[in-house]
């Protein structure tokens, strides 16, 4: 059985979170690290549509490039965009791992892929 922490450990080996830029908030941001993963979604951003798709597909994890929580989350209410997303995901047992600037600068990461594509 694969759990959230297994996937986070694997991703952290490819693009260590310690390499993120100072302003960034990459890493395991929402959820239960011990939860089993049968389905996961990959997204650029965790939008309401992505969360809805995860719910419909009964996914336990969303891995995104851009962080779900970027600035400090001072409250989590349905009146706040980030708070509403976190609450909805928690209610449906969906975790979030976000790999941003650490994936940009990792060997074989986003910057390397862009350079290869551009020649």
Question: What is each PLM-predicted segment?
Answer:
Residues 1-119:
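Hydrophobic structural segments
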């Amino acid at each position: 059985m694969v759990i959230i922490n297994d996937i986070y450990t694997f991703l952290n080996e490819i693009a260590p979170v310690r390499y993120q830029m100072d302003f960034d908030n990459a890493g395991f941001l929402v959820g239960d690290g011990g939860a089993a993963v049968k389905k996961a979604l990959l997204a650029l951003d965790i939008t309401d549509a992505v969360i809805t798709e995860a719910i419909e597909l009964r996914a336990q994890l969303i891995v995104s490039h851009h962080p779900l929580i970027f600035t400090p989350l001072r409250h989590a209410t349905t009146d706040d965009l980030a708070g509403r997303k976190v609450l909805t995901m928690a209610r449906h047992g969906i975790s979030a791992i976000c790999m941003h600037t650490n994936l940009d600068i990792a060997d074989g990461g986003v910057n390397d892929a862009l350079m290869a594509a551009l020649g």
